[in-house]
Amino acid sequence: MVMGLGLFLLVFMLGLGLTPPTLAQDNSRYRDFLAKHYDATPQGRNDRYCESTMRRRHLTSPCKDINTFIHGNRHHIKAICGDENGNPYGENLRISKSPFQVTTCNLRGGSPRPPCQYRATRGSRNIVVGCENGLPVHLDESIFRP
């Protein structure tokens, strides 16, 4: 009985030790997603907005060809990964049931070297995300290309 309890406690403690890094990694990928693609209340949504926001978020070294910022409520974006605001889309992706306000920043010119100049395109559309453990970690920007 004592031996069984000791083994149980050992396995339980090992399980606790392994879980937090996994959760931390998931949260890290989600935080990266938010840093690259989420801006709750943008100012301007024009070319200057794209250039300053891309620079502030360190997405300009080298210049990124395209980046889309999603505006609105973070909870609604998370909900795409469940049935509340998302449906399966393609292979391992989810599409939002409701449209989001977005600003897509397209690199002008062909050089990947700063200074980066962007053209802003504003719109409202459904978005497609990749999810891990119920959190969005990837935005499929192929649907935003002209």
Swiss-Prot record:
Q: Which SMART domains match?
A: RNAse_Pc
Record protein name field: Angiogenin
Q: Which domain of life is it from?
A: Eukaryota
Keyword Cytoplasm present in the record's keywords: the answer is: yes
Which residues are recorded with the post-translational modification Pyrrolidone carboxylic acid?
Q25
Which residues are listed for tRNA binding in this entry? Answer: R45, C105, I127
How would you classify this enzyme at the top EC level? hydrolase
Task: Give the primary localization class.
Answer: secreted
State the function annotated in the UniProt record.
Secreted ribonuclease that can either promote or restrict cell proliferation of target cells, depending on the context. Endocytosed in target cells via its receptor PLXNB2 and translocates to the cytoplasm or nucleus. Under stress conditions, localizes to the cytoplasm and promotes the assembly of stress granules (SGs): specifically cleaves a subset of tRNAs within anticodon loops to produce tRNA-derived stress-induced fragments (tiRNAs), resulting in translation repression and inhibition of cell proliferation. tiRNas also prevent formation of apoptosome, thereby promoting cell survival.
Its gene is ANG
Q: Which residues form the signal peptide?
A: 1-24
Activity regulation = Has weak tRNA ribonuclease activity by itself due to partial autoinhibition by its C-terminus, which folds into a short alpha-helix that partially occludes the substrate-binding site. In absence of stress, the ribonuclease activity is inhibited by RNH1 in the cytoplasm. In response to stress, dissociates from RNH1 in the cytoplasm and associates with cytoplasmic ribosomes with vacant A-sites: ribosomes directly activate the tRNA ribonuclease activity of ANG by refolding the C-terminal alpha-helix. In response to stress, the angiogenic activity of ANG is inhibited by RNH1 in the nucleus.
Assembly and partners are described as: Homodimer. Interacts with RNH1; inhibiting ANG ribonuclease activity. Interacts with PCNA.
The residue numbers the entry assigns to motif Nucleolar localization signal are: 55-59
